[in-house]
Amino acid sequence: MYEETQMEKTFRKLKRLEEMLHDRMFVPVDQVEMSVWTTKKLVHEVPERGLFGPCERGRKWLEEGLYCWFLGDYTIPEKLAGQTLFIFPKIKGYEGMLWVDKKPYGNFTSKVIQNSYGYHYCDLLTKGKAAGEQLEIALEYYSHHYVRGTQPFEESDEVFEIAYDHVDICVKDEIVCNFFYDLHIVNQMAESLSKEQFRRGDAVRALLRVHEIIDYDIDLADPVEWHEKAQKADAVLQEVLSDHNGPHAGFAGLIGHSHMDTAWLWHVGETIKKCART
């Protein structure tokens, strides 16, 4: 039996757990060495290899309107053969674009921070490649530019920076991912639904049960035992989420979209690149 104050503390712990899970969804298993080339020109394909030079960890560029291109080759090792691999650049920049074997492949946005990283921070690299197969990986990052404000006395304090640390190759921890998204939804149910609603009661009971099952100290826990507990806790959440409305309930649908704030945020050349990233 939990009283209200104790339940609120428990809910805060579960929100903190959600944040910890977010940072563990992708597990680094390898790295790829990169070389670098910088330009202010609008380049619409991967530059020639001869333009690139060494790129040291910790290097920074502080310049408005700058594009940093990073280039590297990655050979699938035996230990990762046949697996689905992701690329996680530890590169600070306004926006970035991924090219694989000279083809546009994904984007990165660190301009808006969600938890520790941007909205798009870890992209799919390949599925099921055999050991020994090689990929050419290129990353184009943009430092951004000054955008005129709508207020007469507005001044820009933006720092136009690109900072390179390293580039990780990752695998997805499916158990952690499933647990994270289910916990995120049930946490929202407990926060948003009225206390008089039965559905909120179901969500609260599930969260309290998760609190009893899970080990919060992920780093010190035995990995195998922790994942077993996570699966057990996730099963409790999935039971709540499997309870759907009846056929006569209202319907809610989701529609995704992308839009371009052209004309006033970017010049035409950067808008073309922006469309490609999107």
How does the language model describe each region?
Residues 1-278:
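Carbohydrate-active enzymes and regulators
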